[in-house]
Amino acid sequence: MTGKTVTRADLAESVFRKVGLSRTESAELVETVIDEVCNAIVRGETVKLSSFATFQVRDKNERIGRNPKTGEEVPISPRRVMTFKASNVLKTRILKAHVARKVKLKPQNPAS
């Protein structure tokens, strides 16, 4: 893993370089896309971005949990959670990148 975190500013800069919009327009475009995705998720809609992922809101029922320290049973209230499911295309890209990285890092044995 590289440890790098991609930020909104990084996305806007990438749009600026690749699309040719101004930096301001690029930042506004990134914000608009993120806002639209967030608003749809908050409304309970499924957001499917082909070749990337699906974001979905799920309702979880009330259930009984257990305090790990005391062993006491405690009720866990019902709630809504968001799930992220990577597409098969994204999963394949991640796997290929992982395999390529392993091959690149593999120590070479000198020819005898």
UniProtKB/Swiss-Prot annotation:
UniProt KW keywords: DNA recombination, DNA-binding, Transcription, Transcription regulation, Translation regulation
UniProt cross-references to SMART domains, sorted A to Z: BHL
Domain of life: Bacteria
GO cellular component: cytosol
GO MF: DNA binding; structural constituent of chromatin
A Pfam cross-reference name: Bac_DNA_binding
GO biological process: DNA recombination; positive regulation of metabolic process; regulation of DNA-templated transcription; regulation of translation
Signal sequence region: none
Subunit structure: Heterodimer of an alpha and a beta chain.
Family to which this protein belongs: Belongs to the bacterial histone-like protein family.
NCBIfam families: himA, PRK00285.1
Function: This protein is one of the two subunits of integration host factor, a specific DNA-binding protein that functions in genetic recombination as well as in transcriptional and translational control.
The protein, known as: Integration host factor subunit alpha
Organism: Rhizobium leguminosarum bv. trifolii (strain WSM2304)
